[in-house]
Amino acid sequence: MPKTNRAQPGRLSSRFWRLLGASTEKNRSRSLTLVTDSSEYDDEAAGLTDEQLRKAAGLLNLEDLAESEDIPQFLAIAREAAERATGLRPFDVQLLGALRMLAGDVIEMATGEGKTLAGAIAAAGYVLAGRHVHVVTINDYLARRDAEWMGPLIEAMGLTVGWITAESSSEERRAAYGCDVTYASVNEIGFDVLRDQLVTDVADLVSPNPDVALIDEADSVLVDEALVPLVLAGTTHRETPRLEIIKLVGELEAGTDYDTDADSRNVHLTDVGARKVEKALGGIDLYSEEHVGTTLTEVNVALHAHVLLQRDVHYIVRDDAVHLINASRGRIAQLQRWPDGLQAAVEAKEGIETTETGEVLDTITVQALINRYATVCGMTGTALAAGEQLRQFYKLGVSPIPPNKPNIREDEADRVYITAAAKNDAIVEHIIEVHETGQPVLVGTRDVAESEELHERLLRRGVPAVVLNAKNDAEEAQVIAEAGKFGVVTVSTQMAGRGTDIRLGGSDEADHDRVAELGGLHVVGTGRHHTERLDNQLRGRAGRQGDPGSSVFFSSWEDDVVAANLDRNKLPMETDPETGDGRIVSPKAAGLLDHAQRVAEGRMLDVHANTWRYNQLIAQQRAIIVDRRNTLLRTATAREELAELAPKRYRELADEIPEERLETICRHIMLYHLDRGWADHLAYLADIRESIHLRALGRQNPLDEFHRLAVDAFASLAADAIEAAQQTFETANVLEDEPGLDLSKLARPTSTWTYMVNDNPLSDDTLSTLSLPGVFR
């Protein structure tokens, strides 16, 4: 069999690779050479039976991936296995992508270039090197789809593969985690980690020790979702915000009673508004010690819900429930909610019964979850724009992978208008003009409200457009699959993470040539996002695999990204008087949009960094708790410590009951009070954070104060938990007919559930780090 003739990976300068934080020149050159060398083994691999192919994979020496001489053989075996198992023969660029992930990089591969296949090959490579791999996806659908799609390839190399979704039982989860490669959403992996913190027997553990995380849509998971806390809650009774305050805030007037900043990220009472609220609540002083951490906090939360959070932008209401919208993905954020007070305030604002939230038993951010893994790598279509965050927060490099075929998509410069109204009119006319030719059009909008308004306008003009947003995301795969069909107009919210490719001519590509002759898929953006990555994700839907395509973005000086980041008085306002359409003719317009977007990205990076420093303290404290809990769960430490703390009681029980049962009792008691203390600590931290910004009134740095209070409280948590365990041990009713505390009183919550918190991203406070003292022996 002759060498496979594939397009050679493109060339990038060594300096450029170093700037990306990727591999050294030596390793980069080695990757390119290894891909080329692998073709020499294609004939040999093709001549093997399926069984021989599996055995050959198992005989590879990949223990040292950086130095192994068997990499070319591995790539040849993987290429042959992929073609047999999936019908897809990997291109050289896909093998290059797999190698860069095996080197620990995040790769950037354009939409339609085959990231899923490259990821499966990389996962197999890690396993053959003796590692265990979690392929982390952004939702359950992709986890199951990719596991079933790529499973035959992984199994063809003699390895096992499993997948996990929200419906998976504990037994199914253990079985899936026991496989060599496990596909699961970041949510489910996190929830399993949290649920394991409630078990009192090692046999009940589900989640294994983290080893390799190979992350699909890496920028979405590692950047956009990084600070989202995953939460484990248990049944309890908690007070909801007072309805009188929520109703009162709803009657306040903008500009008189409250003000917002330029980009509507913050809202605050004016002096007039504060006096109005104080009078309505019986003449209280909102800023007195009695009310500053309670009533004022309730008012601020209600004000946030009423003013800043908009229906069909930040959330939708469906089936008498508030559903949050994930802005970076354009779909409902399943199992996600705001912090309790804010969630209740929004529900009250919409006239919906407040949902039960319970008591937070444990929490972990996505960033802290991923940082548990010894090795992290990933793939996405837009890694370069997230390179700074990936380096700063994960120490990850980025490797751009050139396309298999040259990208011939034509990207037109932004069309910029003075007003949003003029822009929207121009968008409708442009879509109609293109639609009349039969060329398929994909329109990317920034939120649900905008998508529905544009959809209605198109329908009124006789354009049979299809809309896809958070309200009908169950139809996602079908709608996206047909978006490249002749004459189809699709209006969609954010395209990130929509795993279905758009093929010219429809899912069956029946009209591929006809659509290609018209110019392929035409993408229209209704405005710049706050980050270039999201714009590029939309553009990247056109021009797949060397197909023709085009894109154009429409913007206005009234768009959010401009209004918040540029001085309107310095913007060019010249338009063409002959057209009268309000379009800016200045050549500086596109450059100003780029500048506004860079400013927005810089602000978001600052917010991420500051919020990370806040969350880092909690992550450090949680790590100490987890370490202590594992020690109690897996060793005889609980029995030994209680024997030392209460020797008389211990000897009394040791004479009456078997040592194994006594050890179980000691472990149960110690774990209960440790978990109880941690839950109380989390509640305390939540209460502090609700009002910590008010410390600025006393000229204190709010988050420095948060750190001080959190560290002080954590130091006492250990002593309090041990003391409580000692008291329980000495008074518990262990022996038959013995008076004292019934151990059944230490029961765990009768029910638990998990959810994600869309934490308040509007704070941009700064904080400094404080060291954590050793709190457990």
UniProtKB/Swiss-Prot annotation:
Highest taxon listed in the record's lineage: Bacteria
Subcellular location: Cell membrane; Cytoplasm
EC number: 7.4.2.8
Catalysed conversion reaction: ATP + H2O + cellular proteinSide 1 = ADP + phosphate + cellular proteinSide 2
Entry GO terms, CC: cell envelope Sec protein transport complex; cytosol; plasma membrane
Keyword match tRNA processing: no
Keywords per UniProt: ATP-binding, Cell membrane, Cytoplasm, Membrane, Nucleotide-binding, Protein transport, Translocase, Translocation, Transport
Xref: Gene3D superfamilies: Helical scaffold and wing domains of SecA, P-loop containing nucleotide triphosphate hydrolases, SecA, preprotein cross-linking domain
Topology in the lipid bilayer: Peripheral membrane protein
GO terms of molecular function: ATP binding; protein-exporting ATPase activity
Family matches, as SMART domains: SecA_DEAD, SecA_PP_bind
Gene Ontology BP annotations: intracellular protein transmembrane transport; protein import; protein targeting; protein transport by the Sec complex
Broad enzyme group: translocase
Residues reported to bind ATP: Q94, G112, E113, G114, K115, T116, D501
SUPFAM superfamilies: Helical scaffold and wing domains of SecA, P-loop containing nucleoside triphosphate hydrolases, Pre-protein crosslinking domain of SecA
Main location: membrane
Role, per record: Part of the Sec protein translocase complex. Interacts with the SecYEG preprotein conducting channel. Has a central role in coupling the hydrolysis of ATP to the transfer of proteins into and across the cell membrane, serving as an ATP-driven molecular motor driving the stepwise translocation of polypeptide chains across the membrane.
Record text on subunit structure and interactions: Monomer and homodimer. Part of the essential Sec protein translocation apparatus which comprises SecA, SecYEG and auxiliary proteins SecDF. Other proteins may also be involved.
Family, as annotated: Belongs to the SecA family.
HAMAP family linked: SecA (MF_01382)
Protein's recorded name: Protein translocase subunit SecA 2
Organism for this UniProt entry: Mycolicibacterium paratuberculosis (strain ATCC BAA-968 / K-10)
Name of the coding gene: secA2
